[in-house]
């Protein structure tokens, strides 16, 4: 199982929610990866063209670095699954934090 969680600033990016999400993955027998997806506003234009209300319009886009700053504390705990941010692995099960740098996360 690969669990993918979009993080939206001010909606589900608090420490408690992130910790509970990881704990839920730990309880799943077949969870191989928890992947956090930074919220983006790329669909805004399409919603406007369709005349639809974009309910998250007031929320700012997040970068990988923004997400790492919110969830990086998870890399200090032993988990039975990998952790990634938009496909970039930041934690490897059984090994720990990967060598990903701030520069890479900000790119």
Spans of model-derived segments:
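Short beta-strands and strand-loop turn motifs
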Residues: 1-7
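Auxiliary Fe-S-binding modules of radical SAM enzymes
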Residues: 7-107
């Amino acid at each position: 199982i690969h669990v993918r969680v979009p993080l939206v600033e001010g909606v589900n990016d608090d420490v408690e929610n992130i910790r509970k999400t990881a704990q839920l993955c730990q309880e799943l027998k077949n969870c191989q990866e928890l992947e956090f997806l930074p919220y983006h506003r790329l669909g805004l234009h399409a919603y406007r063209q369709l005349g639809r209300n974009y309910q998250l319009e007031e929320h700012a886009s997040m970068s990988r670095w923004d997400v790492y700053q919110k969830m990086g504390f998870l890399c200090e705990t032993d988990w039975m699954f990998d952790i990634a941010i938009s496909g970039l692995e930041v934690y490897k099960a059984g090994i720990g934090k990967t060598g990903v740098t701030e520069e890479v996360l900000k790119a």
